[in-house]
Amino acid sequence: TSHNAGGHIHIGASILGEDVEAWRCFLKLYTAYENVLFRFIYGDKINGRKEMFKYAPPSADLIYNGMSGINKAKSISDIKWNLQTNERYAALNFCNVYFKDPGYIYGKNTLEFRSPNATTNEVIWQNNINTFAKMLLSSRDKVMDEDFLDYKLSHEYLPYLGNEYLYNNVNLKNALEFVDLVFDNNVDKIYFLRQYLKNFQENYGIETVVKAKKFIK
């Protein structure tokens, strides 16, 4: 693929539907672990493409800034008004969500996850789709501890600017927390961690997209 190519994944917002608690859990999960997700969705590269911040910049700060209102939300409309729903070029994009009826399944009603990179490797696509889908499903099924996510956000959250290293370096503690929150089997956890760790290759000071050493069969 071109070193300037990105990859977008659309998943039906109907998974969360009109369940305010499910939306709240998903938004907290994404915000708390966006830095882990970025290194993961670099895919078979160890860093993001040059145009990443134009076409797929981090979204966590935007969501975090509206979290007080999200915590008070009583309806999907309340959720919507605390999100930046017009930010089409964001890593997590809400522009295609049909907030008037988020359970709608007969047309375009999707959450868009915009990957910094593209790939022709089908295993990477499978890992990415599986991860984003399982994030939504685990949020819908309330299998995660929302109080734990609140703690993460109130005690550990750092904005992107000034802390860019969090989106590049390996943070094994956060990665292990994430897989335990999202996946219900060890196979999914292993595939995620392999793609996230990339044999612990670092990308400090690298300005061009670099292919990772082979970490999948």
Region roles according to the model:
Residues S14-K217:
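C-terminal accessory/tail domains of diverse enzymes
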Residues T1-E18:
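Long, hydrophobic, well-ordered secondary-structure blocks that form the structural core
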